[in-house]
């Protein structure tokens, strides 16, 4: 192979396999088909291996992934915030594709539907439900830092920082979003409603992840999981209530 004496990329003098200036590999100056194919495989591996390793690790041993990331092994795994946002985007796309809003709020039956007040309440409820379905993923993402804040306030024994609790919450809830997306897809062809198991699977997964991350007994881990679950649901309810109040205020002011 005819290797160049100077780097074709930055024109620096070459002394080895890689350029000391820009890092480009010292290969033949003439482009070959093998080089193109090898470059594709190299870049695919660089792009996909961390995400594949993260997905697999969070599936089989979520606590270990979180501990290793916190300990400094960050090159091996996808950034937790990036992972959570990516999983939320996948869940949003699946819900749009499958026609699943993910919520079933029915407040239109309050009171007597023949009265003006009931009609007004029904209209507010419908608008709230519609907007809530549209922004549910954002509410999910906003709830995760609050869950991490709760963990930071409750689990003081191991002296973990808020950022470490946040990385744990982002990873586990990101993976829960991904598992939800898979269950929504599988819900159509399977004769039983798989989505009804989501709350139970969430509690089991949170308990398992907390047990691996915080190294406490299974009972403490289950308690942390229940607190995480309640905090997350409570924040979603609060966000929905705030949204309803905003819609009500707009209707009262502008008619």
Describe these PLM feature segments.
Residues 1-255:
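Membrane-proximal intrinsically disordered regions of secretory-pathway and membrane-system proteins
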